[in-house]
Amino acid sequence: MKNLYIYAIVLVLCTSCLGYKEMPVEYDYSYKGNFKKYKTFDIMKPSGTADSSMMNATIERSILSRMKFLGYRQTENKPHLLVSFKMFEDSMKFNGYNQPEIEQWVQEGKEDVNYDPKKLDLSSGTLLIQLYDRKQNRSIWQGYSTDLYGAIDFNDKRTLRNAVISILDKYRFWAEGFIENGGQQQSELSN
C-alpha cells in the first residue's frame, strides 16, 4: 500500500509539471519557525477596505492546491499557519536575508544563528507569499518572485499559477504526520 502511495505521488508530480515553467524565486525564513510541527492553514483575507493586490482567485486556488498537496488541512478554527500574498505592480526595495538553505538549517537544528540582512531591488511585477505562525504571531517564511525573467503578468492565470508553484516549491515541509499516515490527512487534528 505504501508503494502505491509513493507511485501516486510521483505520478501527480509528473503530471503537475506539464505546462509548468519554473520561475526564479528567493525565500527567507525565521529561525523561530517550527517547520516540522504545522498541520493546518488558512488564507488571510484583507480587513476593512478591500486591497486588490491581496485578492486574486487564481493565486488563492494555487496556494490551496499546493498546501493541500503538502498535507496541510485548511481550517478557519485556529490554523497553525496563516498564508498571505501580495502583488506588487511597481518596483520596490525589499529587505531579505542571506541564510543557509532551510532544510540544512532545520536538519542541523542550530538555534544561535544570526540574521545576515541583504537589500534587494525588485522591479515591477513581484509576487510575495508569506506564512505566519498564528501562535507566535510572526512571519516564519516568505517567498517572492524575482525579476530575472521580467515582471509577472498578473492578468495571465498560467503565469500566476507558475509563480505560486515556483515560490511554494521552496517551502518543502510536509504537514506533521502526513507522511507517517501514508498521505492521509488526519480527521482529528489538535490545535
Regions found by a protein language model. Give the residues of each.
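Positively charged n-region of N-terminal signal peptides that target proteins for export
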Residues: 1-4, 56
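C-terminal/domain-edge helix-coil "capping" segments
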Residues: 18-32, 118-126, 133-141, 146-191
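Post-signal peptide N-terminal segment of mature Sec-exported envelope proteins
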Residues: 26-46
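C-terminal motif of bacterial Sec signal peptides marking the signal peptidase cleavage site
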Residues: 13-16
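N-terminal segment of the mature soluble domain
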Residues: 40-95
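Surface-exposed short loop/turn segments
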Residues: 85-140, 146
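Extracytoplasmic
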Residues: 38, 78-82, 122-127, 155
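A short, structured loop/turn motif at beta-sheet edges
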Residues: 35-39, 74-79, 131-139
